[in-house]
Amino acid sequence: MKYGIVLFPSKKLQDIANSYRKRYDPNYALIPPHLTLRTPFEVSEDEISGVVRHLRELSKELKPVTLKITKFSSFAPVNNVIYMKAEPTEELMQLHEKMYSGVLEDKPEYAFVPHVTVAQKLSDDEHSDVLGTLKMRDASHEEVIDRFHLLYQLDNGSWTVYETFILGA
């Protein structure tokens, strides 16, 4: 089964992200706005209990993280994804690194750029127009997130929470 590990921001930030995602993100209905801590990975049913145990231990060691959204940005020209950029704080970077340790040990596929996606799979022209508009808006937002979530993917492609882990508990 395919799993992923994410932070879900507050409803306030999710509402802001969704106001764009409804129109510009074809994955809008598959998963709420989130910050990916670990890209999707395959784990068998036999192995998932070990993963959950490992994540429980990690959650006790780690503290809640401050999420500071600073601006709208893009991964162009690599791809036409537009996102709300999160400041790569030490605590957020550490949380990401821990998601690739222990039974989950692996090398991340990409450098970690903490973000919340608001638009993807846009044409070049649409990407340019949307990004130009969003860059003029104030994206400043700060909040503390005290939990992360292990998600799994359903047959229809949507993601749902398998387990939630409280940071520092």
UniProtKB/Swiss-Prot annotation:
Its EC number is 3.1.-.-. Gene3D superfamilies: Cyclic phosphodiesterase. InterPro entries: 2H_phosphoesterase_YjcG-like, Cyclic_Pdiesterase, YjcG. It is an enzyme of class 3 (hydrolase). GO terms for molecular function: hydrolase activity, acting on ester bonds. The active site is at H34, H115. The keyword Hydrolase applies. Keywords: Hydrolase. SUPFAM superfamilies: LigT-like. The keyword NAD does not apply. A motif (HXTX 2) lies at residues 115-118. A motif (HXTX 1) lies at residues 34-37. NCBIfam families: PRK13679.1. Belongs to the 2H phosphoesterase superfamily. YjcG family. This is Putative phosphoesterase BLi01284/BL02661. It comes from Bacillus licheniformis (strain ATCC 14580 / DSM 13 / JCM 2505 / CCUG 7422 / NBRC 12200 / NCIMB 9375 / NCTC 10341 / NRRL NRS-1264 / Gibson 46). The lineage of its organism: Bacteria, Bacillati, Bacillota, Bacilli, Bacillales.
